[in-house]
Amino acid sequence: MIVETTIHSFSLWHHFAHKPGFDSISFAKLARSMDFQGISLSLNDANYRHLGGREIERMESLRAFLETHEMSLEIDTSGTTPAHMSEMLNVAHRLGAKTLRTYTRHDGTAEEMLEKTVGDLLVVTREACDLDVIIVLENHEDFTGSELLEIVERVDHPNLKILYDYGNSQMVLEDPLESLKAVLPQVYSVHFKDHVMIRADDAGQLTVAGVPIGEGFLPLTELTRCLLEQGLRRFTFENVWAYSAPIQDGRKALHGVNLGHGTFAYLDPPFDPARLVLKHSAHSPETLVELEMCALNRGHYA
């Protein structure tokens, strides 16, 4: 069995923010040195975030490096409005990326967000097909597995698939295994990561927090086995140390969720910053960069 492993730029977001000279080429070189076969790159802001700018020369330079070293590319954005998606599909095409990850940024109830997202994606899938780019819609702290599946089935286009994130269903209080079961036939790519739960008394509100892979409570082995049995052969490693997100308002615990136990077990304080950071301002940029690399290596070699 041959499995392609790639790494997400969010794994080193403090490097991009604080380490002088660290850019998309530096990231690709590091990924290659760690034996990853490709990268996922966040372009999730007006200046294309971890690409570092919108210049065509910058895009061509990264594409040339990746093609020279036979590395794959997936790019990330957010939002589903047709004008934005058209722009990003064309950026993906120029960069040589075969997939474009996005998630909804609509407001409202889950039903309202779902309807607006379906309407957007019905417009843009034709262009995705013309450019030979697969749109992967992520379970990004907003939809349950069944809600995400409904979107994809209603759009019903071969260029729209699902990106399954190992832990993001927790933000809507859905068990990761239940979420995966709902979307499994439509999963095209994944974000492999690890999480713990933090009590409201310790974080100000009930919170999901990222830790080095292997040091959290997600059922990594069981989730990975399900995906491999389904036939998935491409996994994106995402170190989410120092990331945290609250439980979404209005969500109630779904089937299989027992707060404080199992996958939703709480991590007790005091928190070792090598494992968990909730307040970035408590550490210098240099310390964040150092701790981030240590967390990446601990997860990579776990």
Residue map of PLM features:
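Histidine-acidic metal/acid-base catalytic patches
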Residues: 1-18, 29-32, 145-160, 170-302
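Active-site-proximal loop/turn and secondary-structure-junction residues that shape catalytic pockets
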Residues: 11-13, 43-47, 79-81, 104-108, ...
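Mobile, glycine- and charge-enriched loop segments
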Residues: 1-21, 59-76
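Catalytic domains of carbohydrate-active enzymes, especially glycoside hydrolases
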Residues: 23-45, 95-99
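Glycine-rich, proline-tolerant flexible connector loops at the mouths of alpha/beta enzymes
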Residues: 37-64, 108-109
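Active-site acidic/histidine proton-transfer and metal-coordination neighborhood
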Residues: 29, 57-162, 300
